[in-house]
Amino acid sequence: MSSAKEQSSVTAALQPEQWTTSSNEALKLFVTNPEAALNFQPTFTYPIFGDAETIYGYKDLDIFLCFDHYTFKPFLNIKYSAKLTDDPEIIDIKKTIDEFLPKLTIFKDEVKWVDSIKEEKDNGYKIPGKLIGSFSENDKEYDIYKIDLKSDNGYELHQRLQILVLLFIEAGSFIDAKDELWNLYVLYEKDNKSTSNNESSIVGFTTAYNYWKYPGAKKFDSTEQELRIKISQFIILPIYQGQGLGQLFYSHLFDKWLAQDDIIEVVVEDPNESFDDLRDRADLKRLNTSEQFDFKAVTPKVDKEWVEKTRRAIKLEKRQFARLLEIILLYKLKHGYPGITKRDVRLFIKKRLYDKNKEGLATLDDNTKKDKLQTAYQALEDDYYRILGDLKLNIKRGNDEEETDTVSKKQKV
């Protein structure tokens, strides 16, 4: 027995790659429903297994982390063909993952997991929150719930969901769900099949924080409350991505916040590129139908008072509203709207870029400064055109006629 251990130790020392596994590949995620177990892979595992995202000391390693589609109760199982036992660098995988999972997670015993889910449902498990919105897409129906984090079931649901933040959001971290200023919104796909269980499936979720905003001395003593909503985490499960559901989820939440008088601004905490894209397109579509937004007013000489008044009315933060105005200007330029020149649009966008980076540019000579600004502008212009894609906006032309299909097919400038 000892000789076998010694042999494996020698092999590990000489061929460590045989005992090293990518944690991104080893960890296999599943959402199970009555018909199937839907598999997807994590984007990141470094918050759990370290920056190298590798696990040493196991052969043929598979880590199965499964969730019920309705309650999201987790099940963990770990399988491997061999394990080194005499190396202090070898981690206890279960102990490592347990730190990020709720205490009620079932380990190894799949029958016990299935029975525990059935027991929860037999005891009357319901979505622990309030229905605040619904929509249909691709012949399917979806509900948005604001989860009651003060309730035991609401808090537990968040505990079950939160590991996904680490696995899909770079630099993501857990929130303090006991802080009453946090909100959790969960998107569900309704079960429209002719079955008796009527169980919806979790599609994604977002967390948002309520910030009190100082209203200024004149309003400070008023009883009116002014809040900023900050979207912190936003996840659509990979098995539901590519269907436009994230954009619809965001848009319906934003519409809810628009209707609340105490909310004066909606901001996003450190958005990544994919969420920026989702947000830009959703915001453009909302402006497209908004009675509070006048596309005619958007020119390179746009009135500053109109900008601030409109931005406040539609509750967008300054950076995001500025981006939307720039995208609309490029849209007008692309489609040949009167009075919009490439030079004016370029100078308009460069001014914001300069103001944003004024401190860093101040140390550069004029030629280098111009080169830096032009490079930044060109990258931004390319990105804006990518975001626009084939999007059509209801902008009236000089003759007060809305853009036609012919105009929309003009060659990009």
Located regions from the model:
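Conserved acetyl-CoA binding element of GNAT-fold acetyltransferases
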Residues: L227-P238
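Non-catalytic substrate-recognition and accessory regions of acyl/acetyltransferase enzymes
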Residues: M1-I229, D255, Q260-E269, E273-F275, ...
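Conserved acetyl-CoA-binding loop-helix of GNAT-fold acetyltransferases
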Residues: I236, G242-D255
